Swiss-Prot record:
SUPFAM superfamilies: Phosphoglucomutase, C-terminal domain (SSF55957), Phosphoglucomutase, first 3 domains (SSF53738). Activated by phosphorylation. Its EC number is 5.4.2.10. This is Phosphoglucosamine mutase. Disulfide bonds: none annotated. CDD domains: GlmM. It is an enzyme of class 5 (isomerase). The modification Phosphoserine is found at residue 103.
Amino acid sequence: MKYFGTDGVRGIANSGLTPEMAFRLGRAGGYVLTEHAENKSTQPRVLVARDTRISGQMLEEALIAGLLSAGIEVLRLGVITTPGVAYLVRIQDADAGVMISASHNPVEDNGIKFFGGDGFKLSDAKEEEIEELLDQPKDTLPRPAAEGLGTVADFPEGNLKYSQFLEQTIPDDLSGIHLAVDGANGSTSNLVSRIFADLNVEFDTMATAPDGLNINKGVGSTHPEALSKFVVEKGAQVGLAFDGDGDRCIAVDELGNIIDGDKIMYICGKFLSERGKLKQDTVVTTVMSNLGLYKALEAAGLHSKQTQVGDRYVVEEMLKDGYNLGGEQSGHVVFLDFNTTGDGMLTGIQLLHVMKETGKKLSELAAEVTTYPQKLVNVKVQDKKAALNNDKIKAVIKDVEDEMAGDGRVLVRPSGTQDLLRVMAEAKTDELVSAYVDRIVDVVKAEVGIE
């Protein structure tokens, strides 16, 4: 697809992703939704939301204008998290939801992501129909002057409904926990205080003052070291860091150690399994999850299923085979019993619930996963597909794997966006992992590398 990537349409705001493009997306998207609407007598309803980056307002106005010109009833949610949109689309009986965000990326980037009425990503077929319309040399879609135009209404109660939903995902409150929260100056900034106060948590916040320019800037789930310091400074038992659009959560234990998505999935998976609530006793992960997670799951008598990198592939696998917990090392964790996508605040609340129920410190809960040292090297290559079929490269990978004898792993995969081959290994020690990666990288460079 030309415009839609795995996470919607992305680009640098106002140059790559322009207001003109947002308007056209609104018109084309609105038209496709109208064509597919089951009930032709009512106007399709679309929820529109954004994160806190300054370009969000510009793109939101343009996108809504496009939707209105195509006859859509728009409910404007304002600033809310991506999983908040996925949830509200379902309960407001909307035909689609649109989130304007570039998630954990820098402030200059922005994106437009569509959700279907079921709260999952819009189907590839519908995205392709939208792309075809965007590629037409001339816009020939209908342009009603009065009857047939859409209307827009603000829907501030969306945030409240979503907050109440999150609070009801656990059976009791979280009193007795001292928490530090990093809102990444993003979409969770205006939610955290309300939710954690309602749940009786004692909490301190940082990075919850968005100014349009400071989203993800040295804070949030991609920079958890900021929260790590804050946790120790405040003497908190646990820290939670979200990203700009609130679909990720990374935790920090009481000592300031970073607890990534792998460890969060293990802790929550084991807890659910012990209560008979983990479907098929299986956790769905991507190939980037650490070997330490698999060893810990195995030791706890749990299974794992692997997918390619990307939270959408995790969700696809979960839906296909009926699993209810999955996610990525980056902190996208999906609790399919509650929501259709990775939800940072939901994940944080579930993790705090496990701490309260077990009475254990986060460092204790996480200690059951021993993370293997990992090294990743990107090699520029002429043809990344051909590199994977090169006999000498295959041979060195096999040699290294044989030497590891199950106490390490190798993953060599092409980059999704650049002419790079990513060479990753995990082993018991830093020395071993460096030696293994260097051996493979030397062969890759000699065979297909370009300087």
